[in-house]
């Protein structure tokens, strides 16, 4: 099997995916932005070949892909890659474009809106009967002001397409709303402010979309507290409430998540779970390592084993 891994250098702990894939006989071809020799020796030795490219430049990416395919052919690996993986929301669009161009199974261009746009996620949540925060994508400032009057303050202003807490604002009054909107060019959503705890339903699916691992995080604070520089915290829960599991497992097939990690965020209000957004990637940073400790196992190895077995 030949797997193209986008950005093998970041985050650093994700090198364990590549090392485990390599140990199970998967040929991993890397396309990233860092210098090859800036990566750890263990990662370098696990890559069959590595091409460096500016991943935000389409021409540079194509040159990198051409180099990899040429080397792949020279090594006796004819044809395209079998799979493409990024494990990083930043490169999900690139992953879909490569799959589309080379006819590789996986996320395609048509799948990206539901995996990246919060307004479309919200429609899917509502369509399957889950409660959502009141609000909508705003078309212009007049509609935004009318909607704000209906929802009341405080409210949340967040980008329709964004990663993590970037670009999210808590708006206390009309003047603040006007000020924020005057600096915004991209599509944004306005939603009512929800006062609730934030929990997650996280996991890994196999090739058929079956959940083969599940876990949950409990946040001590919300993402806005992190944006404000507060010393926030979160922890892994070994016990997943039945209603949270049911809501999470309802969403997995609706978003067609196959052979991938997922990270779903919910508001918890009593025993009600309100979805916030979904992410078709592992939870960020060192959270996978936390989850490994919580289950006394190795998710990097489990992922590699699932991929290698097909």
Please place each PLM-identified region on the residue numbering:
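Short hydrophobic patches on amphipathic alpha-helices
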Residues: 65, 69-72, 148, 181, ...
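Helix-loop-beta segment of a Rossmann-like dinucleotide-binding subdomain
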Residues: 102, 162-163, 228-232
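ATP-binding N-terminal substructure of ATP-dependent carboxylate-amine bond-forming enzymes
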Residues: 1-110, 142, 309-310
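A short, structured active-site edge motif that brings together acidic residues
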Residues: 108-119
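ATP-dependent carboxylate/phosphate-activation module, predominantly the ATP-grasp catalytic core
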Residues: 192-257, 261, 268, 275, ...
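Active-site nucleotide/adenylate-binding loops and adjacent lid/helix of ATP-dependent enzymes
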Residues: 117-195, 206-208, 234-246
